[in-house]
């Protein structure tokens, strides 16, 4: 399983709509509103065989109201 975090910058007034669309995606486990340069943070779990770039392009960038994204790939989770 691959874990990625996607920070999203939304059009003005669209963050809640974008968040609603994101949580409908099977791979998205959590969506947070955040402060700073980006509006939302999505935590996604992908199969090891899934191409991360294609996933972000087809499943994230396709949502209306997103202006920019920044994707971080997680290596290990420490608990």
Predicted regions located by residue number:
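A compositional/biophysical signature of low hydrophobicity enriched in polar/charged and small residues
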Residues: 1-79
